[in-house]
Amino acid sequence: MKSKRRILFPLLTLIALLLCLSPAFAGGETAKTGLGHAQASAVKWQADAVLVQIITVSGNMDGTAEKWSFLFHSPQAKKSYKVDVKNSKIDQTLEVSPSFTDAVDGDFMDSIQAMAEAKKKGLKGKSRAMMTLHVMLQGTKSQGAYWNIVSDQAEGRSTLINAKTGKFFRHQALK
């Protein structure tokens, strides 16, 4: 009887652990995971295309998302191009009017590190977060790329993380 318990208890513990962990890894990728696919598509669209924004409106609280949207701008064509990447594949592309034109330097921290820093500085959420990476100037000490994170429990504020240094910048009221 004792030998059955010795086998059964670790087995049940393993099953419980797997059930608890599986939602955290279900369908989530980091922002940088799909960036290569998006960039290749953007360069086919316009050779001078530069990354200007990354966004997910349905991110997970671990900094991953099922789908990321990448916005590129062509200074020569004066147009923008949106590339949606889902499950490491291009899901949809669309030429759009330019809204952002400042290029995001390729040397930025990934979404999971940005989310971890935001949580360290008080961001709370149940399961969902909107994450945006773009260049900001107004209201910052210096122009640069920032992660702007709003969770499903954001209480009227977003959390800004400097995407180059990985440091918390501030909480900002949503207007």
Q: Whereabouts are the PLM-identified features?
A:
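Long, terminal "pre-/pro-" and other extracytoplasmic accessory regions
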Residues: 2-6, 20-175
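Bacterial N-terminal signal peptides
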Residues: 10-20
